[in-house]
Regions:
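Hydrophobic alpha-helical transmembrane segments
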Residues: 1-119, 124, 128-354
């Protein structure tokens, strides 16, 4: 590594190697792990960025700690320790997905290259595939290692591998969307949330309601097909939007029935109407939604994937948790709809912005 010259390879090597500290969570008490993480937060804000003349840091990261992936990495781990003090296996699993999935994905994307993802010109199929594979193995290994030393009975490696695979897949998709949120925040928090919630699932609930789930799935399939193709005919969505909408819509209807679908449909119609409102004027000013206002799969997943997962949890967890989950389901869709309304109607207002 040349002094003062940024090296992506060195940065990601450090990113991956730091994941090894997650193995210590099997032996460390919570307070000791939190103190070490706090020390890392301080170090990554002070002397670590100066190593090799700043070769670990991208140029854009020198302006603010909130833009520094190096600092956000350690900050995320500290926050996970604060949120999950009794579930260090969750922290370890999420850490494994972050260290191995995100780390090896960048190296593979640059080293292997290959075709780009249809929805992101900056990401490759190779990178996302490696993210999923490496993240799955890293998360499962770290999560199981810590759980086997801190829980009794410990979950099987097979169960942890399945949970880690779901978390890594979700994180790989989020990472591929090139969101403004730094990957060192989005990946560990999403992975930890999935590790924790998926461990709480009760298969007995699915067995008891299997007939109802099959019925709601078939109803959801029919209703969502009609709704999606109607939206396509009205040019409210693109073909990728049809696919993304079917995925989240069928999931929501299967676990929440037609009432949950009605909430989804209401907010979709509301957002689509706001997009069409004053579209010609917005197009002349260059601020209109592209493709004539048709939303794609990225929009469907960004706006509705949280709601779909909450619906899945509401249908898979004990009844005492369901009211809160359905409230969160409505809130997540309302938040996405309000964001759309603000961005579509706001530009139509006259006067100076705040």
């Amino acid at each position: 590594v040349k002094e003062g010259v940024f090296s992506e390879e060195w940065r990601k090597s450090v990113h991956i190697l730091m994941g090894g500290f997650a193995l210590l969570l099997r032996y460390l008490p919570w307070w000791a792990a939190a103190l070490l993480a706090a020390g890392a937060v301080i170090s990554n804000a002070t002397w670590i960025p100066k190593l090799q003349g700043g070769a670990l840091m991208r140029a854009s990261e020198t302006e603010s700690l909130l833009r520094s992936g190096v600092w956000l990495y350690s900050f995320s781990i500290l926050m996970l320790l604060v949120v999950f003090p009794q579930h260090l296996e969750v922290v370890a699993g999420a850490w494994g997905v972050l260290a191995f999935g995100d780390g090896f994905a960048t190296l593979a994307g640059k080293g292997i290259g290959g075709p780009k993802l249809p929805w992101s010109a900056q990401k490759t199929w190779a990178g996302s595939t490696v993210f999923f594979g490496a993240g799955t193995l890293g998360g499962a290994a770290f999560g199981w290692w810590v759980a086997s030393g801190t829980q009794s009975p410990a979950p099987s490696f097979r169960k942890m591998l399945l949970i880690s695979g779901c978390a890594a897949l979700a994180c790989a998709i989020v990472e591929s969307l090139s969101l403004k949120l730094n990957d060192n925040l989005s990946v560990p928090f999403l992975a930890a949330g999935l590790f924790y919630s998926l461990q709480q699932l009760d298969p007995a609930i699915w067995q008891a309601s299997s007939a109802q789930l099959r019925h709601d799935f078939l109803v959801g399939l029919a209703v969502n097909l009609v709704f999606a193709f109607t939206a396509r005919a009205l040019r409210a969505v693109s073909w990728s939007g049809v696919a993304g909408g079917l995925l989240v819509g069928i999931t929501i209807t299967t676990f929440g029935g037609l009432s949950a679908f009605g909430v989804l449909a209401f907010f979709f119609v509301l957002g689509s109407a706001a997009t069409r409102l004053g579209y010609a004027g917005k197009a002349r000013r260059g601020i209109a939604q592209e493709r004539g206002g048709a939303r794609g799969a990225v929009h469907a997943l960004a706006n509705c994937s949280v709601a779909a997962y909450l619906a899945f949890l509401a249908g898979s967890l004990p009844s005492e948790l369901q009211a809160g989950l359905w409230l969160a389901f409505v809130a997540s869709l309302a938040t996405a709809a309000c964001d759309t309304l603000g961005s579509e109607i706001g530009p139509l207002a006259s006067g100076q912005p705040f």
